[in-house]
């Protein structure tokens, strides 16, 4: 199963992704987390692993990877491995991913499509195109799950990355923007025939009813995460998330049923 985790900036995508990944691993699933946000440098810390090498480096970096995708026949002339050539046209398994491009701990693998490391290096289009190819050709066994921690917003829908996933999980925080975005993401998910699920995050007694009423108009709410002081502190300090939270366990059970 391949699942997109999306939402507005700051809604808690990486936090929920991390907690879900760890819970699914405890359920004896083999989990792959794909860091799809070129500006996020904290997901690996939440998982308690080193930041993996940018996957674009496997294809010689952003410039060479771009030429590979845009120029017909260049694959035959480039010094790429068999997997790199197969990547653009054939299906592959989680076990085929080169081990130097992921970090791993306690049954969870983390890989990164790429990061912006310096000014004027160019946009993230190449990284996003490679991500689209990766998701399209990745095949998973029954006991394997991939969680795609997307960048904020809806651009991944425009690129077509979500065409190859099995479901969309949107994280909704208590903000007007997030509530409005839930309607848009529901429409986009429906338009490509993908199920849409929602996780309410940072919920308090004051916000619970309004969030529930608004979001439930657009799809099933499968998780309700209360505002949590310990999670907030861990996010501030960049420490590994090791807590077990009941709503996360419930969401994990829902996803694998």
Predicted regions mapped to residue ranges:
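Walker A/P-loop phosphate-binding motif and the immediately C-terminal alpha-helix
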Residues: 2-36
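Conserved catalytic-core segment of NTP-binding enzymes
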Residues: 19, 26-27, 125-224, 232-233
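N-terminal phosphate/diphosphate-binding loop that engages ATP/GTP or pyrophosphate donors
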Residues: 23-106
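Conserved beta-strand scaffold positions in the cores of enzyme catalytic domains, especially
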Residues: 33, 108-110, 221-224
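Residues in the short beta-alpha loop(s) of Rossmann-like NAD(P)-binding domains
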Residues: 36-39, 202-204, 228
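Phosphate-binding/switch loop-helix module in NTP-utilizing enzymes
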Residues: 79-152
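C-terminal boundary of histidine-terminating zinc-finger modules
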Residues: 235-245
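C-terminal alpha-helix
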Residues: 247-257
